[in-house]
Swiss-Prot record:
The gene is SLD3. The keyword Cell cycle applies. PANTHER family: DNA REPLICATION REGULATOR SLD3. It comes from the Eukaryota. Pfam families: Sld3_N (PF18523), Sld3_STD (PF08639). GO terms for biological process: DNA replication; DNA replication initiation; double-strand break repair via break-induced replication; mitotic DNA replication checkpoint signaling; regulation of mitotic DNA replication initiation. GO terms for cellular component: chromatin; chromosome, centromeric region; DNA replication preinitiation complex; nucleus. It is found in: Nucleus. Interacts with CDC45 and SLD7. Residues 433-450, 637-652 have a biased composition (Polar residues). This is DNA replication regulator SLD3. It comes from Saccharomyces cerevisiae (strain ATCC 204508 / S288c). Residues 429-450, 621-668 are annotated as: Disordered.
Length: 668
């Protein structure tokens, strides 16, 4: 009698079971022993797969498919190590997941027996992939033809930089930024890997120097159109042929306009490539500091270069000595290549080429159908927003990739390509800190002054105008230095014009306006500010007075004269009042103590002498100068005084010139 035994129950059939997936068998529940069937139909075993043994000879896997049917998967080879470590743990701990079961009617309708062949697994899919057979991922579009270009892999860094240099030269549609950020970086990493981190810079610089061209070599290459000739290197010659094939240029036809435009484009690109190589070498050798004062360090070389470029005479007096090829080779070897000067020469070449292209007149009739791309790239050289132009070369290549490495060289290139500026340089404003620190002599002199003199000094300080021309005064605070007028003789002349005040307020550099004459116009009133000189300076006569006070200070070259109020007439300043002429309340001077026009220095009140009273009798009092506290006799006397000049004949008034005062002192 055959005996069944359940060895283990697993949730998933692993690859290590080694089942025979080609020959599954379907058995009914009646064929399974009753004790085994009750064990398999427990709640915690319904979703599991059961590893069973029959008569200790046959091993198979039972899996329930619907009510009343089981699928039997035989073993190819049974390995006891493939079973779980604890056979009972799998059965007891795994719980059945609650799910909706299909009814018997649903399973009968599906007829899953017919679908068993679709559920079979392929044994190849379960096997591990061999190491030799790697998957090849093909990401090409389905409609793409098999003409995709495969990038060449160069293990040798010399071949790599040669390929990328001529690729950047002849591929005019490729931006030069890729040559810096991709090709040069990859070359440096390749040299570091091959030659080590200690000596890779020497090999890296030697490879870059191989593609540096002197000015003579550059001139021979582009003047003779050697780029269109076959190269000795197969890599460079392949790049040249691809460029000519792309623009449908034949080697026989070398005089067409297409080739001429292509030569100009290639010349512009190689100048920029040479600049990039030079900047990389300058950064490796730490030569960036030479560009801080390039003109001073290379003064002799620049002067020698300018002498070599001077034009010679048409008739040569002496025959030129012929030099052999050996001598030329010796000269080239002996002359060392200065990278900084070489960079300056290439920048000159770039500026000259840019000027020639900008001055060239375009001919639209000469443009051929196949010449559109070259013509478009030639126009981009003059377009500042494109990378092909000099400005775009600075913005898109030099500044992003070389500004941190060689900042002074980049600044020198920017100034060189920008050209000389026609604007005058602004003079730097020198800030004098001496105004903030007062000397001890100034403080002592101020303390020695009396109270009235200090008040007069403070009024002078507060009357400084807001005009910028008049603000240019000395550093001292207590001296008043009037600016000399260009025409001092006009100050004492009798005129009704305001030109004197206008000239007084300006600097010495201001010339006398020749078109302004004697006029009563108020056009110059806008330029007038508060008075910076005494009222008596405008009088026609100077009367010396014994009561003149002379103050000599160490911070003033001129003598400060404080005159007493005399019988000289006041002069009207103007009709308008400036905003800056407002006086603070605590700085106003009482009219009973002092008589002055606005911003005139205050004078201490003096006792009135009999002679002074006699002088005051001739003053015509202003009708607006009445006081409320005056006595009746004072008003009567003033009325008599005002009536006396009107009764005089005009002959007497013509002998003496009397001007009207704005404010008259009180006669006490």
């Amino acid at each position: 009698m055959e005996t069944w035994e359940v060895i283990a129950s697993v949730k998933e059939a692993t690859k290590g079971l080694d089942l025979s997936l080609d020959h599954p068998l379907i058995i009914k529940s009646e064929d399974v022993p009753s004790n085994i069937l009750q064990l398999l139909q427990q709640k915690n075993r319904r979703q599991l797969k059961h590893i069973c043994m029959k008569s200790r000879k046959e091993y198979f896997l039972l899996e329930e498919y619907g009510p009343g049917f089981w699928v039997k998967w035989p073993y190819n080879y049974f390995n006891g190590y493939s079973l779980p470590e604890r056979r009972t743990e799998v059965v007891t701990t795994v719980e059945r997941e609650r799910a909706k079961r299909e009814t018997l009617k649903t399973w009968d309708e599906l007829k899953f027996k017919e679908l068993l062949h679709l559920w079979s697994e392929e044994p190849k899919g379960s096997c591990k992939l061999e190491k030799d057979k790697d998957l090849k991922l093909d990401m090409n579009p389905p409609d793409m033809k098999g003409e995709s270009k495969i990038n060449d892999y160069y293990s040798d860094p010399k071949e790599y930089i040669e390929s990328k240099y001529y690729d950047a030269l002849f591929s005019i549609h490729t931006p030069l930024a890729y040559f810096v950020k991709s090709n040069l970086v990859r070359l440096k990493n390749t040299c570091r890997t091959k030659y080590g981190s200690d000596s890779y810079k020497i090999a890296y610089q030697a490879m870059l120097q191989k593609f540096l061209l002197s000015i003579v070599q550059f001139k021979d290459r582009h003047d003779n159109r050697l780029l269109l000739e076959p190269f000795s290197s197969p890599i460079a010659d392949e790049k040249r042929k691809n460029c000519l094939t792309k623009f449908v240029i034949q080697d026989e036809n070398k005089n067409s306009s297409t080739i001429a435009d292509l030569c100009v484009v290639l010349k512009s690109r190689e100048i920029k490539l040479q600049i990039l190589l030079l900047l990389e070498i300058i950064g490796l050798n730490d030569l960036d500091w030479n560009f801080r004062d390039f003109e001073k360090k290379y003064k002799l070389k620049l002067k020698k270069r300018s002498l070599n470029l001077t034009k010679k005479g048409l008739v040569r007096r002496r025959s030129k000595k012929k030099t052999s090829e050996k001598d030329k080779g010796i000269e080239r070897i002996t002359t060392s290549l200065d990278y900084c000067e070489q960079l300056d020469l290439y920048l000159d070449r770039a500026c000259i080429l840019d000027i020639l292209l900008s001055s060239e007149t375009p001919n639209p009739d000469a443009i051929e159908a196949s010449n559109g791309t070259i013509q478009e790239h030639k126009k981009n050289i003059l377009d500042k927003s494109k990378e092909a132009s000099l400005v775009g070369f600075i913005n898109y290549v030099l500044i992003p990739y070389f500004n941190k490495k060689v900042p002074h060289a980049v600044e020198f290139i920017i100034q060189k390509l920008k050209g000389p500026s026609m604007r005058p340089k602004r003079a730097l404003k020198k800030v004098n800190d001496s105004t903030n620190v007062s000397s001890p002599n100034t403080v002592e002199t101020y303390n020695r002054l009396s109270t009235s003199q200090r008040a007069s000094r403070s009024s002078i300080i507060n009357s400084v105008p807001s005009s910028p021309a008049l603000r240019r005064v000395d550093a001292n605070l207590f001296s008043r230095k009037s600016i000399a007028s260009p025409t001092p003789e006009l100050l004492n002349s009798r005129t009704n014009s305001n030109l004197n005040e206008f000239l007084e307020s300006e600097t010495r550099s201001l010339k006398r306006p020749s078109q302004l004459g004697r006029t009563k116009s108020d056009l110059t009133m806008n330029h007038l500010q508060k008075r910076q000189f005494s009222v008596s300076d405008l009088s026609t006569t100077r009367v010396p007075n014994s009561s003149t006070i002379t103050l000599k200070t160490p911070f003033s070259h001129s003598t400060i004269n404080a005159y007493k109020t005399m019988n000289n007439s006041f002069r009207r300043v103007g009709k308008r009042k400036d905003i800056n002429e407002t006086i603070r309340l605590h700085e106003r001077v009482d009219s009973e103590e002092n008589v002055q026009v606005q911003a005139t220095p205050a004078v201490k009140k003096r006792t009135v002498t009999p002679n002074k009273k006699a002088q005051l009798q001739s003053i015509i009092e202003s009708p607006l100068n009445f006081k409320d506290d005056d006595t009746h006799e004072g008003r009567k006397n003033t009325s008599n005084i005002t009536s006396t000049p009107t009764n005089k004949p005009p002959e007497n008034s013509s002998k003496r010139r009397v001007r009207r005062r704005l404010f008259a002192p009180e006669s006490t």
